[in-house]
Amino acid sequence: MDKVIEMFSDYLAHVRRHSENTLKAYKKDVRKFLTYVGKQINNIERKDVEEFLKALSKGDITGESPRETTISRYISSLNSFFNYLELSGMIYENPMERIKHPRIRRKIPDFLTEDEVSSLIGAFNEENELRQKTAISLLYYAGLRISELCNLRTTDISFIPPFLRVEMGKGRKDRLVPLPDKVIPILKKYIDLENPKIFVFENGKKHVHPSTVFRWLKEGVKRANIKKDVHPHTLRHSYATHLIRKGVNIKVVQELLGHTNLSTTSIYLHVADQEKFDAVKKL
């Protein structure tokens, strides 16, 4: 089993050009499936996949009932795996045929107000918490994913003109994110004082771990007395929502966020629509 999974992983990395996070997730999903089924690969049938997905949805695989997005990811993982096996001649019938993704209910993302963002960033002391303040500032002012922040390298920063180069992976073109004036002084001060060598936020020779940034964020939220469940992605949602509110074209927001599909970005239009409904309720 391990050999086939590693061959599959190499295929995803070098042919499909998937990101490291996707590789880890797909390998983990496939390993759980094969362990559950307990069959030789060429003996696996569609009913085995259906039984696994049923057990997964009941919480028998992970210990809790997963969201539709998690089930959909498992299906994507297994689709990729069996497509690879078929291309490689290891199987002749694909058990994933006619296996459909669950219908996912799209949830309007939570976001912070501009005042809450200011309070959050202002909760960090620039003299002895410059690292934390800079990291949280970039999550918002550059709309970064937590993985993008942690993997950010010193060579990805330009001050003239001011922008970040964000690696997109999956064979996609890197995106350039312009930096607003508010974040430039603090980023420049951090780079000048800390002088990071490879990664902007280093931990020895490696980059800082996402859990560390999450801990910084939670501390800032507590100090700012923000009564919302705030995660690193909340700042990215806030960045997109505020841009849409200010009248920025949705296609521009799509490029800034690095979304492949415009439909992914369009969820932020619903945030503005919801505001309208909330407004008329006050009449």
Curated annotation (Swiss-Prot):
InterPro entries: CB, DNA_brk_join_enz, Integrase-like_cat_sf, Integrase_catalytic, Integrase_recombinase_N, Integrase_SAM-like_N, Tyrosine_recombinase_XerCD
Major subcellular site: cytoplasm
SUPFAM superfamilies: DNA breaking-rejoining enzymes (SSF56349)
Domain Core-binding (CB): 1-86
Family statement: Belongs to the 'phage' integrase family.
Active site feature: R145, K170, H233, R236, H259, Y268 (o-(3'-phospho-dna)-tyrosine intermediate)
Domain called Tyr recombinase: residue spans: 107-281
Name used for this protein in its record: Tyrosine recombinase THA_404
This protein's record includes keyword Membrane: no
Keywords: Cell cycle, Cell division, Chromosome partition, Cytoplasm, DNA integration, DNA recombination, DNA-binding
PANTHER family: INTEGRASE_RECOMBINASE PROTEIN MJ0367-RELATED (PTHR30349:SF41), PHAGE INTEGRASE-RELATED (PTHR30349)
